């Protein structure tokens, strides 16, 4: 299963998974992906 949460650090529209992941890494979450609506979501195994 994958746990998900919105990134606290990412601001603006999310177009790059790499930038999103960098923001999530600052929050100690290993993965980040841009979602529909240009939101950055952090993901990790539960």
UniProtKB/Swiss-Prot annotation:
Keywords: Antibiotic, Antimicrobial, Disulfide bond, Fungicide, Plant defense. SMART domains: Knot1. It holds the Pfam family Gamma-thionin. Disulfide bonds join 3-46, 14-34, 20-40, 24-42. Leaves and flowers. InterPro entries: Defensin_plant (IPR008176), Scorpion_toxin-like (IPR003614), Scorpion_toxin-like_sf (IPR036574). GO terms for biological process: defense response to bacterium; defense response to fungus; killing of cells of another organism. Strong inhibiting activity against C.beticola and other filamentous fungi. Little or no effect against bacteria. This is Defensin-like protein AX2. It comes from Beta vulgaris (Sugar beet). The lineage of its organism: Eukaryota, Viridiplantae, Streptophyta, Embryophyta, Tracheophyta.
């Amino acid at each position: 299963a994958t746990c998900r949460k919105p990134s606290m650090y990412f601001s603006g529209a999310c177009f790059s998974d790499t930038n999103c992941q960098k923001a999530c890494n600052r929050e100690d979450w290993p993965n980040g992906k841009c979602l529909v609506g240009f939101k950055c979501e952090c993901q990790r195994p539960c």
